[in-house]
UniProtKB/Swiss-Prot annotation:
Entry similarity comment: Belongs to the RNase HII family.
Originating species: Campylobacter jejuni subsp. jejuni serotype O:2 (strain ATCC 700819 / NCTC 11168)
Entry protein name: Ribonuclease HII
Database matches in CDD domains: RNase_HII_bacteria_HII_like
EC number: 3.1.26.4
Function per UniProt: Endonuclease that specifically degrades the RNA of RNA-DNA hybrids.
Taxonomic placement: Bacteria, Pseudomonadati, Campylobacterota, Epsilonproteobacteria, Campylobacterales
Keyword annotations: Cytoplasm, Endonuclease, Hydrolase, Manganese, Metal-binding, Nuclease
Amino acid sequence: MKTLFDTKELLNEFDINLIGIDEAGRGALAGPMMMAACKLNKQLDGLCDSKKLSEKKREELYEIIIKNSNYLILAFSSEQIDALGLSTCLKKGLKLIKKHFKTENNFLYDGNTNLGINGIKTQIKADTSILQVSAASILAKVSKDRVMNFLAKDFPCYEFEKNKAYGTKAHKEFIAKFGICKLHRKSFKLL
């Protein structure tokens, strides 16, 4: 089992023991932030950063990933984010992921900081080059989008099914017109 990451080696070799981690909804103005961790059982084709895939393709890959991996998806509500802060939620998520997979290392988190959690390596844009992180990216993004599509039915004036609660021009205009709802993150600058 590898415990230290050599990115060039990982790009050329599929590591079945690697657990990729990513999140979706970190910068959204409303709704949950989803964190996902994924340990693929085999190499899968078509995986890349979820933001580079169509919604239809993400949904297709989501179903393939969950059938071919050990994974964990966590949700942090807007209330938790407001009460604890993003960094604390992310730290809590990383700790829960380590506990779930019952290993101390061989984790790769997309980004530039492991928030002080030992055994978790980081790499900027890992979701574009490491299959397990791409898979985690897809799991997190699809989960976040599904939640926002569901919640959109109760809050139609914000069009969450379209903007997924991100700070688009239209979403900010809806906040200015209708005010915030209980899903909005009050600790964020919303306008």
